[in-house]
Amino acid sequence: MEDEEKMSGCEHYAPGPASGARVQKDGEKWTLILVRELRHPPAMVWQAITDPAHLHDWAPFEADGNLDSVGATVKLTWVSTGAVSETRVTRADAPSLLEYHDLRWQLEPLGRGTRLTLWHNIDRRFIAWGAASWHICFDVLDRLLAGAPIGRIAGAEAMKFDGWQRLKAEYATQFGS
């Protein structure tokens, strides 16, 4: 029943326009940088980005363990591809900075909320795809933290939304890809 309720919320979801993203090139490395202002305090956002039970509800991957401590080794299974990678948390300064795999998360207090910045090292060919996907994941995260979950929208599920295709096109235009 709970999954059905989440899916019904998902049916009424439509992402806003592409925003809060940029690309940085350093040699051969490309980094997608996304900034999102959330209405929730850093401690709450920290739990959502480190706890596997919370990640399951919004992130584009499953984590088999908690990501909240340096040295933690966790397997990530990406929803879009099923690819599994073992990663080690290299930085965990709760509730402000988290680094593992190709991801770096920074949480900054912003009034009663949080400015979330994600750096994602990504293949240049997939930058617009990644930006559209993270955009939707962050929308889902915001609703989850507000107590109005709509269910995970990631991987193939995200691509079914007309909004995902529009976002991907908007980000592709923005990034010239």
Whereabouts are the PLM-identified features?
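Short beta-strand segments
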Residues: A83-T87, L103, T114
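Short beta-edge strand/loop motif at the mouth of beta-sheet-based domains
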Residues: K25-L34, H40, M44, P52-P95, ...
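Short, flexible helix/strand-to-coil boundary loops that buttress conserved ligand/catalytic motifs
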Residues: I49, A59, L145
